[in-house]
Amino acid sequence: MQRIKDIKPKELVAGVTGYYAHGDKHTLGLVELKAGSIVPEHHHVHEQITYLLEGQLDMTIGRESYSLTPGMFHVIPSNTPHSAIAIKDCKAIDTFSPARDDYKSSDAAVGWKLEAQ
């Protein structure tokens, strides 16, 4: 048993920090985004579900734009380009399947940046 905040944090981009737990087949993350931070457009083979706990997060998924508020979630299919802007300070839960092996390394951003559009 472990607390998510006891996991070593990974800065994905400026203002975006994640705490990731890994199973054999999926990854769970608590992501904190500072207001104004931008997750640039990228894609990955993993299916992703983002559930917003706090704040307001504007996302573009494929060609559609969405504004997530607390309690809302979105499923991002495999290999679908997506990006986000934190309108307010945010806390979100992200899940990925299959597991994000690239997030298990000490530099999570390396694998992610390689897949950026």
Predicted regions located by residue number:
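A short, N-terminal "cap"/entry segment at the start of jelly-roll beta-barrel domains
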Residues: 1-25, 105-117
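Conserved short histidine dyad/triad with adjacent acidic residue
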Residues: 14, 29-43
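Short strand-coil-strand connectors
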Residues: 24, 60-64
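Short beta-strand segments in beta-sandwich/barrel cores
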Residues: 28-29, 38-39, 55-60, 74
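Short, conserved beta-strand element in jelly-roll/cupin
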Residues: 32-34, 44-59
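A cytosolic small-molecule/anion-sensing beta-strand core signal
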Residues: 53-54, 69-70, 88
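Short acidic-glycine-tyrosine-enriched beta hairpin
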Residues: 63-78
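Ligand-binding loop in jelly-roll beta-barrel domains
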Residues: 78-102
